[in-house]
Regions:
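A generic structural motif
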Residues: 28-34, 71
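A mid-sequence interfacial segment
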Residues: 86-127
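S-adenosyl-L-methionine/SAH cofactor-binding core of RNA-modifying enzymes
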Residues: 39-100
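Short glycine-rich anion-binding loops that position phosphate/pyrophosphate groups of nucleotides
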Residues: 11, 78-81, 108-111
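N-terminal beta1-alpha1 ligand-phosphate binding loop
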Residues: 1-27
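Conserved beta-strand scaffold positions in the cores of enzyme catalytic domains, especially
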Residues: 35, 73-75, 123
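Structured adenosyl-cofactor binding patch, chiefly the S-adenosyl-L-methionine
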Residues: 114-158
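General small-molecule cofactor/ligand-binding pocket signal
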Residues: 6, 34-36
Length: 158
């Protein structure tokens, strides 16, 4: 299984980098992981709705340029469907029956463009709260790792 995570925004804190490295190492037993980090666009103070949409489109174009072909695309967005860890594990297992590559997309601070969302086969939400993209990357990798542990009937703390 190949897993790609495309994320807008740079990881700045060392503790997030350490957590991402740890989960990347753990995941290597189950899947080939590729993390693509894209620069976010500058957001002017008091940006208009039009400027916000233009920024989301620019970031979206960068995402689409990096999107692997023939990959099952999952976008992380607040309006997506919430899953328990067990449900996400089942979803990943089901996807692996028809696709050898899953791409998870994390948008920038303004979210994802409608164009990117339209490319997704699954819109996934981790709840209604807004989380920083740096933390979201850690949470996503932990949940993917947990899903593989569940799917392989291996114990993992609850």
């Amino acid at each position: 299984m190949n897993i790609t995570v495309i994320s807008v925004g740079k990881i700045k804190e060392k503790y997030f980098t350490a957590a991402i490295d740890e989960y990347s190492k753990r995941l290597s037993r189950f899947a080939k992981l590729n993390i693509i980090e894209l620069a976010d666009e500058k957001i002017p103070d008091n940006a208009s709705e039009k400027e916000i949409e233009q920024i989301k489109e620019k970031e979206g174009n960068k995402i689409l340029a990096k999107l692997p072909q023939n990959s099952f695309v999952v976008t992380l967005c607040i309006e997506g469907k919430e899953h328990s860890s067990e449900e996400l594990a089942k979803k990943i297992a089901d996807i692996s029956m028809t696709s050898s590559h899953i791409t998870f997309i994390i948008g920038g601070s303004l979210g994802l463009s409608d164009t990117v969302k339209s490319k997704s086969a699954l819109r996934l939400s981790f709840g209604k709260m807004t989380l920083p993209h740096q933390l979201m990357r850690v949470v996503l990798l932990e949940q993917i790792y947990r899903a593989f542990k569940i799917n392989n009937n291996e114990s993992y703390h609850k």
